[in-house]
Each structure stands twice: as C-alpha cells, then as structure tokens.
Amino acid sequence: MSDTASQQHNPAQLYCLPDGKALVLRTCNAELQAHGGFQWPESGPVSCPDWDPKPKCGNGLHGLLWGQGDGDLVSWNAEAKWMVVEVEAAACVELSGKVKFPSGTVIFCGDRLGATALVAQHAPAGTSIVGGTATAGTWGTATAGYSGTATAGDRGTATAGDSGTATAGDRGTATAGYSGTATAGDRGTATAGDEGTATAGDRGTATAGTWGTATAGDRGT
C-alpha cells in the first residue's frame, strides 16, 4: 500500500508538510464528484483541465485553505466525502470564502473529523477550521470554525462558529455562533447566537439570541 493510500485510511499517521505547500479542505459526494460533475480521485494527483488564475469562481479546483472560509460551501450530508488536498501555497487564488488552485495531491479522503484533524495538525496557530474540533487545556484557548466544537479547560476561552458548540471550564468564557450551544463553568460567561442555548454556572452570565434559551446558575444573570 502506498503512503498516500495508508494516510487516507489513517489520518493520524505522521505526515510531513513539504516547504511551500498548504492544505485545502473540501467535500465531494459519495461518488467523489464535485459541483458540475468533476471527478476527484480518492487519492493521488489531481489537476484542473481549464485552469485560469483570474480571481473569479470557476476554471480551477476549489476548497478552503487551511479549512478556513465559508462553511456553506462544503457539504454536510452524511454521505459526503471530506478531502484534504496538498497544494502549492503560492498557486492558491483567493476568492470569496474559498480559494482555487490549478492542481494538488489528495492525501486524505474520508470522514469530517479525520479530515479536519489532519488539517489542524499543520494549520497555523489559531486557525478556525470549518467543521473541526478544538480542545485546549487549563488556561488555554480553543477556537473552532463553522459547525465546529471548541472545548477549553478551567479559566480558558472556547469559541465556536455558526452551528458550533463551545464549552469552557470554571471562570471560562464560551461563545457559540448562530444555532450554537455555549456552556460555561462556575463564574463563566456563555453567549449563544440566534436559536442557540447558553448555560452558565454559579455566578455566571448566560445570554442567548432570538429563539434561544439562556440558563444561569446561582447568583447568575
């Protein structure tokens, strides 16, 4: 089995990101087809047949550089395949909420958590990865992107994007975006967006947006 194929089935396997390369997160349907019917490989090299570097959508392969961008541009269907593509960083063209690139190498194809975990291992510090999970220890800070989950230890700060879940320990602060859930420990502050749920411990403050539910512990607000 090739190294790439092995990584596909075991994203935790040690992977060394070459100099000048970056990782792009993207999704395909169960048949590995993208919008418009472009066929992606399960692993290995892939290229766009009609590449155009102009900063407009189309004429390129598309995805979220380091997993950052518009979470509405990936598929959240249960059958969706999540891919990690190694690309030339300098070749990426910034678009609205995503990037496009001429070619790359698929190094992972599988589930969301496997893909986002692989990206997180190599992404710049503080990167908010769409669909990812971020966990920090005591005094730490955890930030997750759209639909992600962020958990921080005591006195930490946890922030999750839209539809995400944020949980902070004692004296922590948890903030979740639209439709998210935020839970903070004693003396913490929990803030959830519209339709979210915010729960704070003793002496905490819980704030929920429209249609949300806010629950604060003893002496809380």
At which residue positions do the language-model features occur?
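Short, glycine-biased loop/turn motifs at secondary-structure junctions and
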Residues: M1-T221
